[in-house]
Curated annotation (Swiss-Prot):
Belongs to the DsrH/TusB family. SUPFAM superfamilies: DsrEFH-like. Heterohexamer, formed by a dimer of trimers. The hexameric TusBCD complex contains 2 copies each of TusB, TusC and TusD. The TusBCD complex interacts with TusE. NCBIfam families: PRK13510.1 (NF010035), sulf_tusB_dsrH (TIGR03011). This is Protein TusB. GO terms for biological process: tRNA wobble position uridine thiolation. The lineage of its organism: Bacteria, Pseudomonadati, Pseudomonadota, Gammaproteobacteria, Enterobacterales.
Length: 95
């Protein structure tokens, strides 16, 4: 399943998101959700421990001035890769 987090993790039921993640799921951080990718924040450690791959939309990282601040565990992607993820996952859940 593809999970997309478009809101700040501080304004989301992040605990519920973590509970619903399963091995093989993927999470895309976009819009204000990219703030979860910033190195040193409390949400990043939970994402590191989850059995998933985590991506962040590069355009949103740039727009928020975060490109130099994200964890190496987060995979920056462009819109083409975003489309590939949506094609790959028939089930999606937006947060």
């Amino acid at each position: 399943m593809l999970h997309t987090l478009h809101r700040s993790p501080w304004l989301t039921d992040f605990a519920a998101l973590l509970r619903l993640l399963s091995e093989g799921d993927e999470l895309l951080l976009l819009q204000d959700g990219v703030t979860a990718a910033v190195d040193g924040n409390r949400y990043l450690e939970s994402l590191r421990n989850a059995p998933i791959k985590v991506y962040a939309l590069n355009e949103d990282l740039i727009a928020r001035g975060l490109t130099g601040q994200i964890s190496n565990d987060i995979i920056p992607i462009d819109y083409t890769d975003f489309v590939r993820l949506t094609v790959k996952h028939t089930s999606q859940l937006a947060w």
